[in-house]
Amino acid sequence: MKIIAFNGSPRGPRSNTHAIVAPFLEGAQTAGAETENVFLAGHDIRHCRGCYVCWIKTPGRCIIEDDMAGLLGKMAAADVIVFATPLYVDNVSGIMKQFLDRLIPAADPHFHKDENGECKHIPREGMLASKRFVIISNCGFAEVSHFQVLRLYFRRMARNISCRVVGEIYRTEGELFPLKMPGLSPILDAYRDRVRAAGRELVETGAISEETSARLEEPLIPEALYIGGANRWWDKNIAECGA
């Protein structure tokens, strides 16, 4: 199995998103998968122009000369694609959205009806058709309900290009990852172990079970403790900056 992860955080390898992606890929590797981790912030990805050249004049090929053609090639060669992003304004990061907008060369412009009678695009052969997606996201909020829009967004996107979501990892209290606190270290280590197990499960079974996803969504620390600590952190830093 070949797995490629696309990290849409502007912080790249220093991101809280990477703190989840890294152990996930490690777990997949121990089960025999070949993995690659791509930081989108390090690539030249320009916005879609909406010109439809990739649908009409050069089917399957974008007119923009940047890094997207190579990234699409990597996606086409993978069995599983991991979309990893921090939660920004209830959705994906701007970097990730720009990347996703540029996936339209992978679809044929013609419509057809799915099994529920809803229009979708015909997938272009040899690109993304029938790929499996894993979604990884983290946020600074305390409740998992904040991922409702993002969760639906990726499921709808997968449906429209004839792919399917086979695993989801949504992590609240994400700002705990960079903290260096003795009492917190074993909690984060245990969480990373569970993420590694999810990576192994994906390779061994082809998916991440709902039970595994639910366990990974459990709070790292009590919500009241997290919210209080976060507010004190902001107060301290705002005061130090003289605001």
What annotation goes with each model-predicted range?
Residues 1-111, 159, 166, 185-243:
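N-terminal beta1-alpha1-beta2 submodule of the flavodoxin-like/Rossmannoid cofactor-binding fold
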Residues 14, 61, 143-144, 171:
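A generic secondary-structure micro-motif detector
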Residues 94-95, 107-161:
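Short, glycine-/small-residue-rich phosphate/pyrophosphate-handling segment
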Residues 166-174:
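Beta-strand-loop-alpha "switch" segments that mediate conformational coupling across diverse proteins
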Residues 88-90, 141-143, 173-175:
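Short, catalytically relevant binding-site loops at active-site mouths
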